[in-house]
């Protein structure tokens, strides 16, 4: 199976320019290709992972990746399928984000070894020194307004309004392709399907200005089986930065993927062979309640993004929380697992009665309700039920002298810190 056939079999090719010419280019020898990442935040997220892993697959097949971080285009803002104008960031902010994103990309692509080792580039290197007049004369003249207006990303914004800044973005992305081709012989661009218009601006510029052919592959924007945009949890992006989305949170995200999506995501997000995935799929279909596909998915992706140790910690936390054995976890583990849970700080020597504590920490709305909660067995301290109205917290309830977890009912957790 060729690399192009494998990408197709994994569902990683949404659209291409001339497919026959592209297949021929892969067959004739190593292809130099690039993927662009605009610094719109201080971290990449799961949505970026599809293109990143596609780049890694091509590198493993012998092709040479260029990872372009948009130090210049990040200052402008891509209008593609955004309902409103993006807020412009300061140069200092974008530079900081560029540095962080470069560090994240180095986890997935090999920048050290072989003739096809990855190369990191920043488009500020060429845009930073070009004058506005030169850009209009040397690049702008190759794009008609009619051509630019025909792009879906622009059409959608015409009625609500689009600034010239964002309107010109597609020319900048097109020029990236031209520069990378001239400097490094790059002939292929890979990106999300929402980037098709911007990406083909690059092939158009190559054709008109240099009389050369360029290729484009778009990877699909991943949605779940309900059509919901993938890569967000409770409305928030699942980040690749462990300080923004912990390995435990990422593990839980994959563990809770819907059954109908799990095997498909194994093809997209893991490096397991298609044969292995087929076998996992068969076993999974025999007993979906055991969630084999989700467990393998969580193992593979968390290990890939954060390492084996982080994966094992996420599993340990999950198992102990499920068993209600909170005292088997460290305060650090619990803080990771309960990130975002309401927290109440009390003095280490404050000996509050359980009823007073529940009211003061706003766990129960009133003393009457607090007493009922305790008597009805709805209150748990570190996983153990408390039904004694005279119960007072002691040092044994303080995990690592740092934290106590109180649960009200089945799911409402609260954290006490000292």
UniProtKB/Swiss-Prot annotation:
The alphabetical list of record keywords is:
Aminoacyl-tRNA synthetase, ATP-binding, Cytoplasm, Ligase, Nucleotide-binding, Protein biosynthesis, RNA-binding
Residue span of motif 'HIGH' region = 39-48
Task: Give Gene Ontology CC terms.
Answer: cytosol
Q: Give the residues the record marks as binding ATP.
A: 232
Gene Ontology biological process terms, A to Z = tyrosyl-tRNA aminoacylation
List ligand-binding residues for L-tyrosine: 34, 169, 173
**Protein known as:** Tyrosine--tRNA ligase
């Amino acid at each position: 199976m060729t690399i192009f056939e494998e990408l197709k079999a994994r569902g990683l090719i949404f659209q291409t320019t001339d497919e026959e010419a592209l297949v021929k280019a892969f067959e004739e020898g190593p292809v130099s290709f690039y993927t662009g990442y605009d610094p719109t935040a201080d971290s990449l997220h799961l949505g970026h992972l599809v293109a990143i892993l596609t780049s890694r697959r091509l590198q493993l097949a012998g092709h040479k990746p260029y990872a372009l971080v948009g130090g210049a285009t990040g200052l402008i803002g891509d209008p593609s399928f955004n309902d409103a104008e993006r807020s412009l960031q300061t140069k200092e902010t974008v530079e900081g984000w560029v540095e962080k994103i470069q560090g994240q990309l180095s986890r997935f692509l090999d920048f050290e070894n072989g003739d096809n080792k990855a190369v990191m580039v920043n488009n500020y290197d060429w845009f930073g020194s070009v004058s506005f007049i030169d850009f209009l004369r040397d690049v702008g003249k190759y794009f008609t307004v009619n051509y630019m207006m025909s792009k879906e990303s622009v059409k959608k914004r015409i009625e609500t309004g689009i600034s010239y800044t964002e309107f010109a973005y597609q020319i900048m992305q097109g020029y990236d392709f031209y520069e990378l081709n001239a400097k490094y012989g790059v002939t292929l661009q890979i990106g999300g399907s929402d980037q098709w218009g911007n990406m083909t601006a690059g092939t158009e510029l190559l054709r008109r200005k240099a009389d050369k052919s360029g290729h484009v592959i778009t990877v699909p924007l991943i949605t779940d089986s309900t059509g919901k945009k993938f890569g967000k949890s409770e409305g928030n992006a699942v980040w690749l930065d462990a300080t923004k989305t912990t390995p435990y949170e990422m593990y839980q995200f994959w563990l809770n993927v819907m059954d109908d999506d799990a095997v498909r995501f194994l093809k997209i997000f893991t490096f397991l062979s298609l044969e292995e995935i087929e076998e996992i799929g068969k076993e999974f279909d025999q007993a979906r309640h055991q969630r084999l596909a989700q467990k393998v998915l969580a193992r593979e992706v968390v290990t890939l993004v954060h390492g084996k140790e982080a994966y094992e910690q996420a599993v340990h936390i999950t198992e102990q929380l499920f068993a209600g054995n909170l005292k088997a976890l460290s305060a650090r583990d619990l803080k990771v697992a309960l990130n975002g849970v309401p927290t109440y700080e009390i003095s280490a020597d404050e000996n509050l009665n359980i009823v007073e504590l529940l009211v003061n920490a706003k766990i129960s709305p009133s003393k009457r309700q607090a007493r009922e909660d305790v008597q009805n067995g709805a209150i748990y301290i570190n996983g153990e039920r408390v039904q004694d109205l005279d119960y007072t917290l002691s040092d044994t309830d303080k995990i690592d002298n740092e934290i106590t977890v109180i649960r009200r009912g089945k799911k409402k957790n609260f954290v006490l810190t000292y």
